């Protein structure tokens, strides 16, 4: 017979009372009614908020977008192969956030901030909301510092300033991404953090861009966010906001940042797909009514912060793809109206051999003039006008048989200016090299050089300056001004290079 010991029973009861966990966990749970095409209809989730993160049974995450009377429409951020009708869904009470910080530089991540480059986890504990309010008026100051792209035609005629939104627009295969990549490469040594967002692109293209950046030492200060063509529409829609959040972290630390959205046409198409599947009413070109807000809330996050806020900046270069040069379509006109200017790339100019194929006549920078360096502003003032007039005269001269001497001279000057502005890919020029090249063309110092030799002349001029006049380059890079002494030196060098070149022709 086992004896019952009261003290033992008492201690067991006390232990159980002590260990009793009386906390109650309340979770907001729903049931999947319907699933397909990356969209789930969920019954329940009465307490869910718009934009709240949801967690499905198999670990897939989603975002609640449509809050209707009897169900919730959510988009899935993954394949969701384990989700089916009747699956449980839990609201998390959180809004989508992404890891940020120094450790992100040099990495390739997906729109959720997860690494996809095979280099392991990213050692950072900082996070930031993907959707963040843009800085208010008081927190900003006007654009006043240059963001050098290294591309002469842009820095001279369509200058971009830190904190500006400059649209790159053109048909497919006209060199839009090339301009963006060149701009990233040109930030080497400038203490600028770059974020390249690839939306709906082929994985091979993104891998190629990453390799180009690595070869040129630009990946060290760049974060690549990739939502490939095979990714769900929800991830393609989120990718630009993720890029903006990563850049914002550095901007609020007082750093200069550059974000490239390549391209926002595909983001709008992904959003249209999601909206139509969620049965939102379609508008023009079947886009939903809030597609303008989709891009405006993204691009308004680019800013030049006031000194009180640390003086950081986020420069945005959104890219838009047009169909047969039609800039009056819905998305192009929306983004043109949001941004501070546009660089228009022409397929005709591209096919005629002009690279970068910038159409100077309809390209403009609305605020960049205030940020342009004095050295290039002084000499490039007439360049845009001369090239625009040349384009008109060139079209007119095809129909006119006898042209007066002044018109012929203007045509010849225009041909040489256009040749001077040709620039191979991945070879950005510094300020001093740009000043030298533009000065030679605008001042008419190369009018005697044959048109076919102008590109060769520009290369020789840059080489001569590097080898024999390094102090000229250093002075311009330091002072950012072209004084009378430097101008005399430059004129002398140009004439010397021209004479030696003409002697061998």
From Swiss-Prot:
It is found in: Cellular thylakoid membrane. It comes from the Bacteria. Keywords: ATP synthesis, ATP-binding, CF(1), Hydrogen ion transport, Ion transport, Membrane, Nucleotide-binding, Thylakoid, Translocase, Transport. Gene3D superfamilies: 2.40.30.20, ATP synthase alpha/beta chain, C-terminal domain, P-loop containing nucleotide triphosphate hydrolases. Coiled coil: none annotated. It catalyses: ATP + H2O + 4 H(+)(in) = ADP + phosphate + 5 H(+)(out). Pfam families: ATP-synt_ab, ATP-synt_ab_C, ATP-synt_ab_N. The record marks 363 as: Required for activity. Its EC number is 7.1.2.2. It is an enzyme of class 7 (translocase). It is a peripheral membrane protein. ATP binds at residues 170-177. Produces ATP from ADP in the presence of a proton gradient across the membrane. The alpha chain is a regulatory subunit. Belongs to the ATPase alpha/beta chains family. F-type ATPases have 2 components, CF(1) - the catalytic core - and CF(0) - the membrane proton channel. CF(1) has five subunits: alpha(3), beta(3), gamma(1), delta(1), epsilon(1). CF(0) has four main subunits: a(1), b(1), b'(1) and c(9-12). This is ATP synthase subunit alpha. It comes from Prochlorococcus marinus (strain AS9601). The gene is atpA.
């Amino acid at each position: 017979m086992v004896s019952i010991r009261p003290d033992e029973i008492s201690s067991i009861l006390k232990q159980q009372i002590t260990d009793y966990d009386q906390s109650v966990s309340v979770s907001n749970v729903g049931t999947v009614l319907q699933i397909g095409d990356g969209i789930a209809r969920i019954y329940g989730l009465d307490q869910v908020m718009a934009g709240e993160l949801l967690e499905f049974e198999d670990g897939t995450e989603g975002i609640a977008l449509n809050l209707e009377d009897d169900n919730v429409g959510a988009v899935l951020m993954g394949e969701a192969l384990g989700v089916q009708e009747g699956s449980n869904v839990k609201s998390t009470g959180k809004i989508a956030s992404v890891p940020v910080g120094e450790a992100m530089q040099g990495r390739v991540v997906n729109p959720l901030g997860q690494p996809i480059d095979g280099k392991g986890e990213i050692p950072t504990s900082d996070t930031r909301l993907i959707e963040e309010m843009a800085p208010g008026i008081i927190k900003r100051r006007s654009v006043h510092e240059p963001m050098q792209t290294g591309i002469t035609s842009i820095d001279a005629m369509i200058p971009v300033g830190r904190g500006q939104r400059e649209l790159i627009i053109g048909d497919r295969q006209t060199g839009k991404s090339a301009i963006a990549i060149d701009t990233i490469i040109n930030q080497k040594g400038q203490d600028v953090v770059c974020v390249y967002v690839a939306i709906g692109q082929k994985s091979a293209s993104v891998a190629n861009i990453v390799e180009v950046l690595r070869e040129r030492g630009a990946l060290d200060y760049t974060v690549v966010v990739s939502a490939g063509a095979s990714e769900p529409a929800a991830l393609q829609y989120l990718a630009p906001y993720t890029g903006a959040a990563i850049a914002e972290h550095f901007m609020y630390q007082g750093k200069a940042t550059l974000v490239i959205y390549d391209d926002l046409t595909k983001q709008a198409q992904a959003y249209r797909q999601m909206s139509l599947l969620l049965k939102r009413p379609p508008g023009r070109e079947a886009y939903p009514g809030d597609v303008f807000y989709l891009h405006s809330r993204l691009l308004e996050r680019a800013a030049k912060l006031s000194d009180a806020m640390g003086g950081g900046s986020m420069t945005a270069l959104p890219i838009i793809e047009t169909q047969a040069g039609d800039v009056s379509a819905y998305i192009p006109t929306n983004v043109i109206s949001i941004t501070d200017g546009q660089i228009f790339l022409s397929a005709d100019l591209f096919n005629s051999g002009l690279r970068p194929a910038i159409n100077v006549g309809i390209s403009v920078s609305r605020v960049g003039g205030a940020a342009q360096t004095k050295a290039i502003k002084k000499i490039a003032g007439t360049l845009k006008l001369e090239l625009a007039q040349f384009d008109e005269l060139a079209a007119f001269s095809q129909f006119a048989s006898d042209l007066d001497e002044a018109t012929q001279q203007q045509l010849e000057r225009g041909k040489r200016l256009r040749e001077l502005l040709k620039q191979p890919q991945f070879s950005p020029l510094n300020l001093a090299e740009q000043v030298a090249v533009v000065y030679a063309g605008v001042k008419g110092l190369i009018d005697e050089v044959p048109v076919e030799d102008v590109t060769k002349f520009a290369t020789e001029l840059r080489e001569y300056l590097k080898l024999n006049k390094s102090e000229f380059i250093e002075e311009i890079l330091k002072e950012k001004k072209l004084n009378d002494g430097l101008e005399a030196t430059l004129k002398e060098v140009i004439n010397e290079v021209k004479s030696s070149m003409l002697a061998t022709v």
